[in-house]
Curated annotation (Swiss-Prot):
Annotated protein name in UniProt: Cell division protein SepF
Gene3D superfamilies recorded: SepF-like protein (3.30.110.150)
Pfam (any one): SepF
Highest taxon of source: Bacteria
Biological classification of the source: Bacteria, Bacillati, Bacillota, Clostridia, Eubacteriales
GO cellular component, one term: cytoplasm
Length: 150
């Protein structure tokens, strides 16, 4: 009975419509949406076991090119993730420079490295191999392997 009196008073003051609108908004907000799982439980799980500790033997290939045309074969070996030592001592200087430019571009494009081991001898390494040359830094810092000027 007291609820009816309050409803009538709220109706006279104009509050009843606001209460109904608030209730409708709450009801609209609580509308449940059907959620579909990203992975259904009915699908078969394809677990693939991959060995993390694989013993892959690194292969080093030593090449002494006779012409510039062998540059493509050398870079194909680098693409196959092999370490290549290239000896260009028998090539003319201009041809050796062209070969070196080609190999340098290929190693850069593949993320590898090209280092000079000795005069006219280079090592091409893929991105998975780190080449350090500590001997070269020692030579630069001490101006020779043996420091005779003490």
């Amino acid at each position: 009975m007291s609820g009816k009196i309050l409803d009538k008073m709220a109706g006279l003051l104009g509050l009843e419509d606001d209460l109904e609108e608030d209730l409708e908004e709450v009801e609209e907000e609580t509308v449940e949406e059907e959620v579909t799982p990203l992975i259904s439980s009915n699908t078969k799980r394809n677990n693939k076991v991959v060995s993390i500790h694989t013993a892959v033997s690194a292969k080093v290939k030593i090449i002494k090119p006779c012409s510039y045309e062998e540059a493509v074969d050398i870079c194909d070996e680098l693409k196959n993730r092999k370490i290549i030592i290239v000896n260009t001592t028998d090539l003319e200087t201009k041809i050796a420079q062209r070969l070196l430019d080609f190999m340098g571009g290929a190693s850069y494009a593949l993320g590898g490295s090209l280092e000079e081991v000795e005069k006219s001898v280079y090592i091409l390494a893929p991105s998975t191999v780190e080449v350090t040359n500590e001997l070269k830094s020692q030579l630069i810092s001490s101006k020779g392997i043996f420091n005779w000027n003490k």
